Amino acid sequence: MKITVITLFPPSHVAGIIAGDGTLSGGHIQGIAPQAFIVSVRVLDAHGKGRLSAMLEGIRWLKENGKRLGIQIVNISVGSVKKQKENSQLVKAVESLWDSGLVICSAAGNEGMQQHNITSPGISRKIITVGSCDDKEMIDEGGRFYHNYSGRGPTIACICKPEIVAPGTNIVATNAMKGKMTALIQ
């Protein structure tokens, strides 16, 4: 399985959570898909800052090259801080990837305690949005538990988000080892 991680350089902690093979821990700490092949698409700078144009370029690159590389899943662990609508350029671009047959997972964002604060592109009704659920201050909203910083829905368009919540704090994962990266697409 090939998974794309839209990330900053070097490949992020998220790549280790997904595909860490446990080599340095003697197999004790592995990602959820240790046999996965990661394709990292750089859309943020070394400080974690980015522009919409870089995200759109990364998505365009995936659309043009994803099938050739056998990519099946795209993980987007970045999001906008501004409230965007479902018809925004970013949401439309991500939905076009979904429509091309890729599974898209996106972070719910870190905008916190109130409703209607899922960040884009997680507001899309097509993609899978993931929130965090593990804080000392767990919040129960109708049987759905959220971390106090995790973005939560429903979206402004009344789409129930996130679809999935999982641990999101103090997660142990691997780092990319020098010489172990197959390729970096910038």
Q: Where are the predicted features?
A:
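Catalytic-core regions built around general acid/base machinery
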Residues: 89-104
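Hydrolase catalytic cores
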Residues: 15-18, 39, 43-45, 74, ...
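Short acidic, glycine-rich surface-loop motifs adjacent to enzyme active sites
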Residues: 38, 59-85, 107
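Glycine-rich, charge-decorated loop segments at or immediately adjacent to ligand/cofactor-binding or catalytic sites
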Residues: 110-126
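Subtilisin-like serine protease catalytic core
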Residues: 1-53, 67-72, 123-126, 154-161
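Extracellular S/T/G-rich loop segment that most often corresponds to the catalytic His/Ser-adjacent loop
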Residues: 122-186
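Short beta-alpha junctions and helix-cap segments that line functional grooves
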Residues: 26-28, 90-94, 114-118, 149-151
